[in-house]
Amino acid sequence: MPRSLKKGPFVDDHLLKKVDVQNDKNTKQVIKTWSRRSTIIPDFIGHTFAVHDGRKHVPVFVTEAMVGHKLGEFAPTRTFKGHIKDDRKSKRR
């Protein structure tokens, strides 16, 4: 179930402050964050966030198409190595 419209999108306060400071200074430095739950708002467009995936920080450049999504959607937490296509050693037994 989506969030109520009267509440508005959730954004961590510390993240919003960092973006506002960079917008005031007209700088575009990478913002390191652990807040995967924050919703991307139009103020974030053009900024790069380093979103933590549990192991390292993944750089995410925010575009217009990302508005309304969560930061964590763009930093996958699981690595898929792929299925083994053909294992000849186990078939010989």
Curated annotation (Swiss-Prot):
Q: Which UniProt keywords apply?
A: Ribonucleoprotein, Ribosomal protein, RNA-binding, rRNA-binding
Question: Organism's domain of life?
Answer: Bacteria
Single GO MF descriptor: rRNA binding
Recorded hits in PROSITE patterns, A to Z, give: RIBOSOMAL_S19 (PS00323)
SUPFAM superfamilies listed in its UniProt record: Ribosomal protein S19
Report the transmembrane regions from the record.
Answer: none
Q: Which Gene3D superfamilies match?
A: 30s Ribosomal Protein S19, Chain A
GO BP annotation list: ribosomal small subunit assembly; translation
Q: Does the keyword Nucleotide-binding apply?
A: no
What HAMAP family does the annotation carry? Ribosomal_uS19
Indicate the family of this protein: Belongs to the universal ribosomal protein uS19 family.
Briefly, what is this protein's role? Protein S19 forms a complex with S13 that binds strongly to the 16S ribosomal RNA.
Name of the molecule in the record: Small ribosomal subunit protein uS19
Gene that codes for this?
rpsS
